[in-house]
Amino acid sequence: MADPRIDFYILEAGVDRRQFTCQLIDQAYRRQHKLFIHCESEQQAFELDDLLWTYKTSSFVPHNLQGEGPTPPPPVQIGFSENAGNFRDILINLSLSLPSFHRQFNRVIEIVDQSAEVKEALREHYRYYQSQSYQINNHKIAAPVQS
């Protein structure tokens, strides 16, 4: 298996990490990708699950929490354990730690907001990815212009 492509989305102050995560999930789903969202905790997983139900009133992203729902699972699965099942396409890592299963994915997405804890943890992830010679892309996301 080829090394994963790594994408860091660096959010300016004023960009909500949870809302941006939902936006990325929605875009990837519409492009027919299958995603595994790795959360820091069960609470974060439940919060993201709830947010995806209300993120957009005009559309729906089929998703479930890992271990719940139908077999096969919908194209978007949210988990917090050290197991991503059979998902191989895109990993969105919302955890402060790097999951051991990241290598099974074609693409890994890391979302960096302005909190010191997230920035420090994801700097460590960046250094690790560099040490593995993974292809790394950085995307700066500007805050919406207030009118």
Provide a role label for each language-model segment.
Residues N106-S147:
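Glycine-rich, aromatic-bearing surface loops/beta-hairpins
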